[in-house]
């Protein structure tokens, strides 16, 4: 029987690579604004923030999600953090396991471990690796890392690292270990690996036709792999990432993204390899780019537009997912970006989670009984006046 979630249980978060595509702006200020944004999300009641790892091209400027999360956790109270994602082929698995365990303790269990093969070819080149090795490398790393997180001893050798009687000298705060997620974009490889190991699934983009269409089959691939390997998965452990910017009006949203959308598209056309923009998009006018992106499953509009988009993603997933993550792309300037997240918290989250249903029912009930209530109130007031008059007359008689 296919598992189906209730949409009102959907959680909300941000997926922060993050993107800072204007190379003329201060990266120092950008990093501190990223920390401030996480504080803002925490105050607004968001559930999660996922932080990326990148090492080249000057746009996705966080090299260590663990360092960023450690700082952000000290500034926040409730929001949970995910590594989105750690590129396992770049690291010795013992060092990665140790850092995640330490972070699990420092955050008192507010960390989730997302991993993948690495996204930027320039990163891979700089450490002397080949793109064709990455899928094998990431699973070699995970096969060593998972038992390390469980407190087991590992001896293992690959072409890039060796472990001899390796063990983590402290156990995780979260038992048996923090929740683990495998990243996925379009291919079936991510869901298949996640299912094989019983992991959560992080669908890192839904902003192209291919990625949107892949949602339809992702759960079945994930679930089939889990069943074939004696694992159990849960739709609540599925994260879906989308590209959104909302404002009070569609016109305002389009005006807001003029701040940085063009540079962001240039990055994906000229440098990065993620399928978020069609070839030649940078040659179009900005309005044409915006129209094309809206047609390609992006929201640049109002809270109602985003609600409709989430409904479509939910339908496409054939049963729902646990959290929707808004990609922190910095298309708008910082005040408009913060307002975007406020509008989601003010209007989109309450609608999806049906926070105000009870308020609406209470209003309807009170309205339906308004006239009878007024009659009863007037009777009560009249009774008080009559009692007061009775007492006044009794006092007059007594004083004679």
Regions inferred by a protein language model and the residue ranges of each:
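Flexible, glycine-rich active-site loops centered on histidine and acidic residues
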Residues: 7-29, 89-160, 200-203, 207-213, ...
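Glycine-rich, proline-tolerant flexible connector loops at the mouths of alpha/beta enzymes
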Residues: 48-72, 87, 119, 206-210, ...
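Acidic (Asp/Glu)-rich catalytic clusters
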Residues: 4-7, 42-43, 69-78, 100, ...
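Hydrophobic faces of well-ordered beta-strands that scaffold small-molecule active sites
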Residues: 12-16, 49-51, 81-84, 111-115, ...
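Conserved, mostly hydrophobic/aromatic
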Residues: 12, 41, 45, 53, ...
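An alpha-helical appendage that flanks or caps ligand/catalytic pockets
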Residues: 1-8, 134-168, 210-323, 339, ...
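Active-site mouth loops of central-metabolism enzymes
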Residues: 18-32, 86-94, 174-186, 245-247, ...
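N-terminal beta1-alpha1-beta2 module of alpha/beta enzyme domains
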Residues: 1-81, 177-178, 363-364, 397-398
